[in-house]
Amino acid sequence: ETIATAIRIGNPASWDQAVAAQVGSKGLIDSVTDKEILSAYRLVAAKEGIFVEPSSAAGIAGLIKLKALKKLPKDKTIVVTVTGNGLKDVQWVLNSSTKPIIIPVDVKKAAKVIGLK
């Protein structure tokens, strides 16, 4: 069970291909916790402005985990593909975001709230 609904599959159809890719690339397959996924989810949104779904954040969470464990090669380029748009699974952003500020329909007031004036 995981919050990452797109990868919440008991018996994935492409498991054999995933293992073949892992072996062929001399990579690894590991797991991350929901807490690690949500931390990566928030990080990529805050630092890069990218709105991903939790399933896409799982790869980033894995990279962060490997860095913390000092298991990343220093002489290699690492790529994490994030293909799942955050609009696929908006419940987690709604649950984890702060309450929105409600302002009147007024351009000057809106600009002030977001720090433009």
Model feature map: region roles:
Residues 1, 61-117:
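Phosphate-binding loop/pocket of nucleotide- and phosphate-handling active sites
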Residues 1-51, 95-117:
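Active-site/ligand-binding loops adjacent to catalytic centers
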Residues 7, 11-13, 36, 56-58, ...:
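Glycine-rich beta-alpha junction loops
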Residues 38-45, 49-65, 76-78:
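Substrate-binding/catalytic subdomain of NAD(P)-dependent oxidoreductase enzymes
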